[in-house]
Amino acid sequence: MTTPTTLKYAASHEWLSEDGTVGITDHAQEQLGDVVYVELPEVGREVTAGEAVAVVESVKTASDIYAPASGRIVAVNEELSGNPELVNSAPYEGGWLFKLEVTEEGSDLLDAAAYDAQAH
């Protein structure tokens, strides 16, 4: 799967869209294996870039998901409660995790080329 060039990426394998949507990268979901549960943050919670805010559990492991930007959680992907496998099948579309009202982007976000270079 090609890494979308319209997104920004954290070295910890999260992506951030222009509208504040956050998910994990295709590389991350491949490393995790089959996702069986996603623990999402509470809507309204204030988060800081780099803070652990969610957990993705797979058959292999559980992995913390970090906020790629500071802001307030304004939505979570309710679809994941019944369909956590969306994180595997559509990491950049239906498998998004939460949306932020961004107050400040993380200073170390990468473009697609830089992310691909460090992820592989």
Swiss-Prot record:
Its cofactor is (R)-lipoate. The keyword Phosphoprotein does not apply. One of its GO terms (biological process) is glycine decarboxylation via glycine cleavage system. The keyword rRNA processing does not apply. It holds the Pfam family GCV_H. The modification N6-lipoyllysine is found at residue 60. Binds 1 lipoyl cofactor covalently. Residues 19-101 form the Lipoyl-binding domain. GO terms for cellular component: cytosol; glycine cleavage complex. Gene3D superfamilies: 2.40.50.100. Keywords: Lipoyl. The glycine cleavage system is composed of four proteins: P, T, L and H. The glycine cleavage system catalyzes the degradation of glycine. The H protein shuttles the methylamine group of glycine from the P protein to the T protein. Belongs to the GcvH family. This is Glycine cleavage system H protein.
